[in-house]
Amino acid sequence: MSKPLLEVSACYRSFQAGEQQLTVLKDINLSIARGEMVAIVGASGSGKSTLMNILGCLDKPSKGSYFIDGQDTSQMDVDELAKLRREHFGFIFQRYHLLGDLNAVGNVEVPAVYAGKDRLERRERAESLLSRLGLGERLDHKPNQLSGGQQQRVSVARALMNGGDVILADEPTGALDSHSGEEMMRLLQELHREGQTIIIVTHDMHVAQHADRIIEIKDGVIISDEPNPASNIAAAPKTEVIPAKTKARARVAAWDRYAEALKMALLAMSTHRLRTFLTMLGIIIGIASVVSVVALGEGSQREILKSISSMGTNTIDIRPGSGFGDRRSARVRTLTASDANALKNLPYVDSVTPSIGSSATVRYGNKAVTATVNGVGPEFFRVRGYELAQGQFWDDDSVNALAQDAVIDENTRKQLFPNSSGAMNSAIGEVIFLGDLPVRIIGVTQPKESAFGNSDALNVWVPYTTVSGRMVGKKYLDGITVRLDESVPSNAAEQGIISLLKMRHGTQDFFTINTDTIRQNIEKTTATMTLLISAIAVISLVVGGIGVMNIMLVSVTERTREIGVRMAVGARQSDILRQFLIEAVLVCLCGGALGVALAYLIGVVFAQAGGSFQMIYSTTSIVAAFACSTLIGVLFGFLPARNAARLDPVDALARE
């Protein structure tokens, strides 16, 4: 005698009902051979559905053993049972249990997706099965576009998809009219004749008469197990062989499962568009806030650094005394032109300018204004980054000759020569008086912003020797400004300058102002403020993540039956986990994309509104935004996805 396909021995199944234990199946002993057509008959509450669930590996006995083709299922985990369902069983449910978002072909393909079949192969097989069952013209119809009988035939095709050994039909005619019910039974008999093992679970003895063996169950006990003399259907040996998966095919199958999960996630999102958008809203606001804040911080920082650069890029100012506010600084007279010449010879110094400042009344004709007269060297304009609008700068010869040549700024030109903007009315060559000293204008600088915006100060620059010898009569300097080579670290250069001057003076009777230190401090301050505001914006992301988790928990509850169907046709726990996790991540990624788009829109509005600087968007912040979206999807989507994956398939299928 050949080994039975299914064998149940001394099977008990108990459930906890409050403080009592309810035993639904008692000492069930049953074997079913390959190719049999068996009907399990019993009234409601008799235990027939529980027995079917055990036979179909949806449930496990509390005690006893169950063998499938010689394999003991008692020690198998949930994924091993899922594999048995994929390879050995096909389910036909009373209520069809089709997935409403998929068409007929899509529903039939589901078991093959989890079995890892090639996409083209499974589609061809699904279409072939549906055509064979008379649904060739309904391939693209969704369940709500099909009649009850047509939906049941789709479920039959789904049961046959993986070519399993056993078809389990739970009340296959229960939801059909009499005509459709008879058609269904003829279809099952036809499948039996082709060698399929059929197990029908029903309360209707008329339906059971179509089987060649009838098992009657009552109060959890088999009371009869007899052949049906009225049946004369001979089963042919089943010859269909499902090809084994290779490693390469397994990799493609894994990708197909991801693609299927992505498709289902998109379908779920499109089905509940408003809810999905509201779920995304927290993510959108959070991502837009973070990206916008970073862009604002970067833009403002660049603007401030640009303003600082207007004072002279990479410069060090040297002043007498110990620091700002030192009352003794006026008595320190050790900074001289020879110090400036010594500094100029340092290898890391680009240019140097001495400086002597004075305030004077500047007169031209009947116009008189108060301006700052700056005695500087010929390299001053390079050090400070000034450019000419008209004329020229003076040179070393002018310095040595105490030349009475002057360069004025745009503000001074406007005050003294309001009509001299054109070349025909240029201020060049005009003579003005600095106090009582006449000087000739040889150049006009272009307008230049100060470190903190436009300056209205009036500036006149003349050789420092002229100021020293012809105006103030002092031999010492008010300060020296050094521009460093761009490739040299400013802190190291600053220490070199201090060491040289200390050696020359014998003491440190001066202090330095390093613009690079100012720049670094501003960068740190801006980064700190950006981090602070971003941290506040991240709260919105967390709130959005909680919203995603909440909606995903609702989605799991709404789609419990779908989860049960997927498990019944062979989905692993990892497949269910992946599907809901991908959906959560997809919601967050879409929210992240919309958030970045909103941030760019904010930038456009900011520019149109006349912002004082431009928002600078960085690739890093955008990549970080998407990484953050993905992380939120994983973190807040994991709990709902895990809950879905841990659902009991029997409970899930029974959920309304």
UniProtKB/Swiss-Prot annotation:
Residues 6-244 form the ABC transporter domain. GO terms for biological process: response to antibiotic. One of its GO terms (cellular component) is plasma membrane. Signal peptide: none annotated. Keywords: Antibiotic resistance, ATP-binding, Cell inner membrane, Cell membrane, Membrane, Nucleotide-binding, Translocase, Transmembrane, Transmembrane helix, Transport. One of its GO terms (molecular function) is ATP binding. The chain crosses the membrane at residues 277-297, 531-551, 586-606, 621-641. Gene3D superfamilies: P-loop containing nucleotide triphosphate hydrolases (3.40.50.300). ATP binds at G42, A43, S44, G45, S46, G47, K48, S49. It is an enzyme of class 7 (translocase). InterPro entries: AAA+_ATPase (IPR003593), ABC3_permease_C (IPR003838), ABC_transporter-like_ATP-bd (IPR003439), ABC_transporter-like_CS (IPR017871), MacB-like_ATP-bd (IPR017911), MacB_PCD (IPR025857), Macrolide_Exporter_MacB (IPR050250), P-loop_NTPase (IPR027417). SMART domains: AAA. It holds the Pfam family FtsX. It is a multi-pass membrane protein. Its EC number is 7.6.2.-. Its main location: membrane. It is found in: Cell inner membrane. Belongs to the ABC transporter superfamily. Macrolide exporter (TC 3.A.1.122) family. Homodimer. Part of the tripartite efflux system MacAB-TolC, which is composed of an inner membrane transporter, MacB, a periplasmic membrane fusion protein, MacA, and an outer membrane component, TolC. The complex forms a large protein conduit and can translocate molecules across both the inner and outer membranes. Interacts with MacA. PANTHER family: MACROLIDE EXPORT ATP-BINDING_PERMEASE PROTEIN MACB (PTHR30572:SF14), MEMBRANE COMPONENT OF TRANSPORTER-RELATED (PTHR30572). Part of the tripartite efflux system MacAB-TolC. MacB is a non-canonical ABC transporter that contains transmembrane domains (TMD), which form a pore in the inner membrane, and an ATP-binding domain (NBD), which is responsible for energy generation. Confers resistance against macrolides. This is Macrolide export ATP-binding/permease protein MacB. It comes from Shewanella sp. (strain ANA-3).
